[in-house]
Amino acid sequence: MIGLQMRQCWTQDTEAGIQRMNDTQLRDEVMTIFLAGHETTANALTWTLYLLSQNPTVEDKMYEELCSVLGNNGDSGKDDSIPSSSNSSSIDNKRIPTVKDVPKLEYTEKVLRESMRLYPPAWTMGRHAINDYKVGKYIITASSVILISQYVMHHNPRYFSDPDRFYPDRWTKEAKSQLPRFSYFPFGGGIRGCVGEPFAWMEGVLLIATVCQQWKMHHDDTHNKVELKPLITLRPKNGMRMKLERRK
């Protein structure tokens, strides 16, 4: 992505409406990519690990999938071309997940998807109205700034039954196909949607699989109560202190 933007600094096609990107624009775009891809992913993983610690049945089901795909003291899912972890003899037959494993980690993806429904890192976004619109009894004039909250929409019982429940199994293919457009949009949507969405899904699934195949999560209940702190991203107000138990 950065390479494409750097080439844009030297490319100009007046007839096609392509203008050169100056150094300031390139710097701003690079900063956007780094900032948008850092804190959002960190918060998504934080909330996911917390939810797993509070829902042991879900955690166990996901771990069963990880063992099936990545191996667990046996040959299941083992790929001899990929070196196994050597951190402990008890996990020697578990290999590190790769991009090729992502399509097989269906339940892990559901866990991440449900986590970002309950706690979307990008919890609200703004849009400028380009024309006058009437929405119900409300008139939105051109150039108005409209705030759209993923958090509010993702907790709407019209679209998600029992919306405050962490329930990854709700994300069946049929259920996803029946959801109205933009009822679930953790990465925004339309032409201004997050350009890094495909990478973020891949990264999130692989990170969760890598961590949870080795460790079991326990939330430190002696720490402060878990509260929301909605800033640019949705983060836990007092941080998230976890205890890690190595799996055997």
Region annotations inferred by a language model:
Residues Q5, S115, M242:
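A residue-level signal for conserved active-site and pocket-lining positions in enzyme catalytic cores
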Residues M31-A42, Y50, Y138, T172, ...:
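Cytochrome P450 heme-iron axial ligand motif
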Residues K216, T233-K248:
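C-terminal helix/juxtamembrane-tail motif
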Residues T11-L70, S115, S144-S149, F185-P186, ...:
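Central I-helix of cytochrome P450 enzymes
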Residues M1-A16, S88:
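Cytochrome P450 catalytic core segment centered on helix I
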Residues R127, S149-Y151, R170, G188-G189, ...:
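Active-site proximal loops enriched in glycine and acidic residues that flank catalytic Cys/His/Asp
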Residues T14-D28, A142, M153-M202:
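Cytochrome P450 heme-binding Cys-pocket and its upstream "meander" loop
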Residues M1-I2, Y50-A122, A129, G136-L147, ...:
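Cytochrome P450 I-helix active-site segment
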